[in-house]
Regions:
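Gly/Lys-enriched N-terminal cap/neck module of very large, oligomeric protein machines
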Residues: 2-131
């Protein structure tokens, strides 16, 4: 099992839809200060169900939604999609790839999907119980 890709939109500093591919064996994120490395890690934690804003260096969960800049308007939604390789069958679904998506609206409503089917946080957590 390994992270295959991460797609981030409206999450923290990622105002534009950003797609990151990971290769099997990737163990580090490298880049200069302020380029978003910590926000990539926060995005992975968040899509997997992190409920503490403080664990993601934020005051409230709404703070993970892109808040705008002088040249860009704030967004009303944050969305992160994580694709995980399950070729070794370590997760309890009989498929080679599992996609988990989380979306948060400024209203506070949060939604989860597993492989395109709407799910609950409990379902996301259950995927990883035996890992």
């Amino acid at each position: 099992m390994f992270l295959k890709s991460l797609e981030v939109f409206g999450f923290k500093s990622f105002a534009d839809r950003t797609h990151i591919e990971f290769a099997d064996g990737v163990t580090a994120l490298l880049g200069p200060n302020g380029c978003g490395k910590s926000n990539v890690v926060d995005a992975v934690k968040w899509v997997l169900g992190e409920q503490s804003a403080k664990n993601m260096r934020a005051e409230s969960m709404e703070d993970v939604i892109f808040n705008g800049t002088q040249s860009r308007k704030a967004l009303n939604v944050a969305e992160v999609t994580l694709t995980i390789s399950n070729e070794q069958g370590l997760l309890p679904l009989d498929i080679s790839e599992i996609t988990i998506k989380r979306r948060l609206y400024r209203s506070g409503e949060s939604e989860y999907w597993i492989n395109g089917t709407q799910a609950k946080l409990k379902n996301v957590r259950e995927l990883f119980w035996d890992t």
